[in-house]
Amino acid sequence: MKYENFNKELEFITNERLRNNAMIILNNLPDYFFQVQAASTGKYHPSYALGEKGLIRHTKAAVCIANNLFNIYKFDEHTKDIILISILIHDGLKHGFEYQQYSKFEHPLLIGQLLNNIKNELTLTEDEIKEISTNVSSHMGKYNTNN
């Protein structure tokens, strides 16, 4: 199963229902997500995130950073779990639904579409889907667009 690339990171999600949903979402990501480097041009990510499976390493690093921040900033467990799911899938459609050579500028917005496409497989509430979609859609800050 695709989610097995993130077994350690999935253990950080304390709620079993949310963890199971994260696994379902990860399994619905395109195969390329689990093979490509984090940056198609190599410009915007550190060297550890380049090369084969770099996007996996990038995602693992982001989860690690979040867990360290959780020691400083206090969130309830549900919020932490939603943040972790968001991080795990934030670049899941980086090259679109079908692989394209370069990153899709609007890739953060595509996750919301994916979640809506598979919501019958999920036990997430509408609010949880919206929160995850919002988290992911804003992960590029001012470099993001929704037009």
Model-derived segments and spans:
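Inter-helical turn/loop segments and adjacent helix faces that build the functional surface
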Residues: 72-77, 119-126
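Short, amphipathic alpha-helical segments
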Residues: 56, 77, 102-109, 126, ...
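Acidic/His-rich, divalent-metal-binding segments that scaffold phosphate/diphosphate chemistry
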Residues: 1-99
